[in-house]
């Protein structure tokens, strides 16, 4: 079947198209060249005047896995439903469910979302959950850096190729797309009773530093050709003065590609009456000097939310801020940790206001949407359902000023934001949330509208209120199927999971099994990721992407 | 006759995956690494494989059609038991969503003591490999650990190797409340566990005073819950001195009213010790009869643990209102589906309403249900996934034999389509 989207205004940075009026043709779920005769189309959608972009891609959003499910069960009161209209699709009225996650992303025109914290031992759980998220495609980033096996290798001082085999094996075993490092060594140190962990601190019992763990994993990611650079949650999250940690981590990258996650939480100085100040300018200054670094923001938005993180040191240190007053910390299988702390960001709060301001300062100062990505670290800075408001904040200076008037004014007085006049264009948004995001992840088949791309397409009705525009897409196509029409879900389908499968020396499996026999009483096969979907075979479920050179933004 | 190695068990909740099972046609024999829980559960003989409607043998399609008709005419169906694998729960929840049913896992009244604690104040917990590799002091509260998980000590405590313990046999085991039923807790070198015994109804007091001692509160009494304060001080000081202390309990063994308050006190003890600058973690023992699997799948599917009503057209969670026993007693349910793929002895609460049973082959009834469909057991008759007690690990179950039994998921999906 040939589908024609007629007369839309195309925003596709991959083709440098900014509002170009052109038709798009879809056949068998893929964007195709214009046929010789337009009359050949079987179905035609007249979208004259509407804004057309590739489906959006969220590079960092906690949507599945053990800690997310624990957060659901911890907080029944946060997602209670009262009135709901059934769509006659299963679970369409279940809030904060796998179904709602897929639906609400799709309604905004998002079609691919990355779960950035898959603990290898929990990968089967994460994939079982992701397989139940409808419509959108997903991918996971596998966490290493607190696991005994790696730290043991580092303590022994093995050759890099053994590390590389282990990283590659982990990506195979977990069916993930990339590598995540969370406060390298910190979760392990917490189990040995450390309560803080800096870049040059050593993990007790191993004598290896956070820096060494991080650099070794970064090198492994480069050498086994992971397209997505090592995805790093730095040390000292949320601590005043931690901009120095972020800058030191950029230096530690030694010119090789590295992605720094939710960097707003590291844009902190320790000046002023309260010992807490914005260091966005200093952070961005460092960012501009390190073209090998990409970052996502992790913007704070004002709402009740819950923070979910593998950085148990950071989470535990914030337990007294839990609102409501209940929280979970988990030591997980000598591999990692989890911390779940509910939190409410308030405009009246000096700290929360400043966090909000710092996030926006980072967005506006960075000047490079090819290297700086749009996230709220869902749900840690705010739920993804608030993205449309964040897009409006970026695109609409007057709206920003209106919002700033509601904030804690002591914080506003310390911020540059009122003097930053930049307004993001639709083209900037398309770079940040589509084209650059796909390239950063190594997903060549999406993030653009060129022939051959998966037909994941979002069509918006342009409005002055950008929150309204991006909150409810006019049409969304997933693999060429219409899934959203006029802001409503019209089709439920299965998504797929995106993976890379780098090569490794098979010998490692025997060594790992001996290790698991000794320390885990678990067979590797018992927790292998397989048969995860109710409706799809693994062959349909998992889409393999090529390994290759890690992302380095060349467009800036 | 074949032998299958490395068989994972869906029965014990501990994700034991080193069983060797001999398969002879449809009969199974555990020949290596069995235990009092797993061996009888695997060896349960196969019995009926054909569905029955009103006691008469029929085919699956007829049984499914009858089940669908019962659900169709019901105003408030109940889907109980919920003892199955991940796909079974997926299908069960889809059927509940479609029919507006109440979903209630059979062990929820026990699980509730943990869940209420989680939802009121949270907790700090750990997992089995952390216990194995770090735990130097284990405090067991009111629980006979070895009857719950017979191989717990062998697999996780009296181990040859542990990452952070030079000598795993020197771990300290302390029981408060229930004394152990056997000697699994005695170390291989002959060191017995310390046992501070009290009765069920004394346990809340003993645990509360233990917490007070850990917090350094002055205690004037000489004993609490029948245990001398000096003994409770011995427990407190060992837990505080532990490098990585673990406190464990099984809510099924806490058989007194408002056990959730004692669970909460235990969880607060763990937090207090961490507040005081050393490490301690909790280990809730759960996971029999697919309990953890049901709660996990229900969690990501509805947002709530496995006691949820779909009657209003959206999932609604209430840990008390949707207790199936209460609902049946109050006449609030007019049809039920009972799902129990693991245990032939776990039968529906009552058959006063039209009843459909998806049960393990061999389930016998005093009063025949309207529809009985024998289903395969996950991990024996079909592959599947189950969550281990500590939640982090999901394990893959194997198919060991072909007895022609459908899976829970297949049957429930067929019923859902027919409704």
For each predicted feature, which ranges?
Chain A
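Active-site neighborhood of phospho(di)ester-bond hydrolases with catalytic His/Asp-centered motifs
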Residues: 53-59, 114-116, 261-262, 296, ...
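Residue-level marker for buried hydrophobic side chains located in beta-strands
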Residues: 4, 43, 55-57, 230, ...
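Histidine/acidic residue-rich metal-binding segments in metalloenzymes
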Residues: 158-183, 187-373
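Histidine-centered catalytic micro-motifs
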Residues: 55-66, 229-237
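Alpha-helical scaffold segments that flank or form the walls of functional sites
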Residues: 69-139, 156-179, 208-223, 553-555
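Active-site metal-binding motif and surrounding structural segment of the metallo-beta-lactamase
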Residues: 37-53
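Flexible loop/turn segments at secondary-structure boundaries
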Residues: 64, 121-123, 147-150, 186-190, ...
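Active-site microenvironment of metallo-dependent hydrolases
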Residues: 1-27, 32-38, 65, 72-75, ...
């Amino acid at each position: 079947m040939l589908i024609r989207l007629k007369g839309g205004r195309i925003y596709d940075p991959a083709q440098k198209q900014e509002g170009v009026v052109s038709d798009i043709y879809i056949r068998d779920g893929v964007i195709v060249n214009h046929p010789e005769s337009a009359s050949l189309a079987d179905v035609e959608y007249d979208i004259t005047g509407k804004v057309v972009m590739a489906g959006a891609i969220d590079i960092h959003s906690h949507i599945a896995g053990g800690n997310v499910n624990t957060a659901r069960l911890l907080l029944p009161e946060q997602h209670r439903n009262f009135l709901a209209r059934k769509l006659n699709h299963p679970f369409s009225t279940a809030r904060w469910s796998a179904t709602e996650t897929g639906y609400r992303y799709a309604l905004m025109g998002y079609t691919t979302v990355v779960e950035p914290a898959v603990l290898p031992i929990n990968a089967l759980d994460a994939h079982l959950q992701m397989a139940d998220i409808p419509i959108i495609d997903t991918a996971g980033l596998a966490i290493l850096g607190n696991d005994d096996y790696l730290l043991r290798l580092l303590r022994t001082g093995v050759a890099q190729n053994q590390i590389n085999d282990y990283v590659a094996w982990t990506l195979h075993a977990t069916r993930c797309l990339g590598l995540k490092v969370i406060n390298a060594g910190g979760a392990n140190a917490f189990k040995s009773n450390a309560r803080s962990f800096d870049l040059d601190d050593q993990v007790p019992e191993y004598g290896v530093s956070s820096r060494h763990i991080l650099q070794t994993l970064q090198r492994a990611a480069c050498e086994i050709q992971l397209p997505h650079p090592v995805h790093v949650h730095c040390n000292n999250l949320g601590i005043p003065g931690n901009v120095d940690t972020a800058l030191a981590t950029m230096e530690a990258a030694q010119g090789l590609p590295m992605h720094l996650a939710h960097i707003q939480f590291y844009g902190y100085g320790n000046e002023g009456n309260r010992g807490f100040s914005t260091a966005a300018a200093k952070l961005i200054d460092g960012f501009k000097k390190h073209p090998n670094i990409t970052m996502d923001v992790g913007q704070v938005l004002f709402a009740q939310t819950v923070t979910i993180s593998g950085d148990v040191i950071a989470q535990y240190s914030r337990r007294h801020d839990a609102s409501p007053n209940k929280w979970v910390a988990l030591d997980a299988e000598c591999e990692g940790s989890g911390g779940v702390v509910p939190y409410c960001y308030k405009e009246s709060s000096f700290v929360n206001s400043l966090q909000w301001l710092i996030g926006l300062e980072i967005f506006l100062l960075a000047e490079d949407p090819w290297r700086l990505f749009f996230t709220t670290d869902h749900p840690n800075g705010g739920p993804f359902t608030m993205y449309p408001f964040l897009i409006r904040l970026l695109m609409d200076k007057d709206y920003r000023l209106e919002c700033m008037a509601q904030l804690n004014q002591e914080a506003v007085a310390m911020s540059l934001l009122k003097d930053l006049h930049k307004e993001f264009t639709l083209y900037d948004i398309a770079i940040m949330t589509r084209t650059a995001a796909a390239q950063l992840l190594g997903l060549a088949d999406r993030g653009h509208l060129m022939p051959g791309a998966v037909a994941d397409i979002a069509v918006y009705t342009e409005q002055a209120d950008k929150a309204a525009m991006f909150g409810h897409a006019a049409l969304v196509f997933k693999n060429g199927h219409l899934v959203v029409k006029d802001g409503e879900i019209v089709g439920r389908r299965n998504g797929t999971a995106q993976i890379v499968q780098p090569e490794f020396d098979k010998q490692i499996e025997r060594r790992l099994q001996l290790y698991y026999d000794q320390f885990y009483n678990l067979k590797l096969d018992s927790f292998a990721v397989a048969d995860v979907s109710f409706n799809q075979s693994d062959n349909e479920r998992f889409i393999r992407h090529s390994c290759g050179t890690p992302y380095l933004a060349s467009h800036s | 006759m074949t032998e299958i190695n490395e068989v994972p068990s869906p029965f014990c909740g501990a994700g034991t995956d080193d069983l060797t099972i001999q398969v002879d046609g449809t009969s199974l024999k555990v020949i290596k690494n069995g235990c009092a829980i797993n061996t009888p559960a695997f060896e349960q003989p196969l019995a009926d494989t054909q569905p029955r409607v009103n006691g008469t043998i029929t085919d699956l399609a007829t049984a499914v059609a009858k089940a669908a008709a019962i659900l169709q005419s019901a105003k408030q169906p109940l889907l109980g038991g919920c003892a199955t694998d991940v796909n079974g729960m997926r299908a069960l929840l889809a059927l509940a969503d479609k029919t507006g049913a109440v979903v209630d896992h059979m062990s929820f009244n026990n699980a509730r003591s943990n869940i209420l604690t989680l939802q009121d104040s949270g907790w700090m917990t750990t997992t089995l490999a952390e216990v194995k590799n770090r735990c130097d002091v284990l405090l067991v509260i009111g629980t006979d650990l070895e009857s719950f998980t017979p191989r717990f000590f062998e697999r996780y405590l009296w181990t040859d190797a542990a990452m952070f313990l030079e000598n795993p046999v020197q771990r300290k085991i302390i029981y408060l409340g229930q004394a152990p039923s056997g000697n699994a807790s005695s170390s291989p070198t002959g060191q017995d566990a310390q046992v501070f015994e009290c009765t069920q109804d004394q346990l809340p007091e003993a645990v509360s005073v233990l917490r007070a001692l850990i917090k350094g509160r002055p205690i004037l009494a000489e004993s609490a819950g029948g245990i001398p304060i000096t003994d409770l001080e011995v427990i407190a000081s060992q837990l505080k001195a532990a490098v990585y202390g673990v406190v464990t309990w099984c809510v099924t063994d806490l058989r007194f009213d408002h056990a959730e308050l004692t669970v909460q006190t235990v969880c607060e003890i763990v937090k207090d010790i961490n507040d005081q600058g050393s490490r301690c973690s909790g280990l809730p023992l759960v996971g029999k009869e697919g309990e953890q699997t049901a709660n996990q799948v229900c969690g990501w599917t509805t947002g709530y643990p496995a006691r949820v009503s779909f009657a209003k057209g959206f999932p609604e969670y209430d840990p008390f209102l949707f207790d199936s026993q209460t609902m049946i007693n109050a006449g609030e349910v007019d049809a039920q589906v009972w799902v129990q793929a693991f245990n032939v002895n776990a039968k529906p609460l009552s058959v006063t309403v039209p009843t459909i049973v998806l049960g393990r082959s061999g389930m016998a009834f005093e009063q025949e249900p309207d529809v009985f469909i024998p289903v395969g057991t996950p991990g024996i008759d079909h592959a599947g996934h189950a969550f281990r007690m500590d939640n982090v690990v999901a394990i893959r179950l194997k198919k060991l034999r072909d007895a022609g039994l459908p899976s829970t998921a297949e049957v429930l999906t067929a019923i859902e389509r027919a409704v």
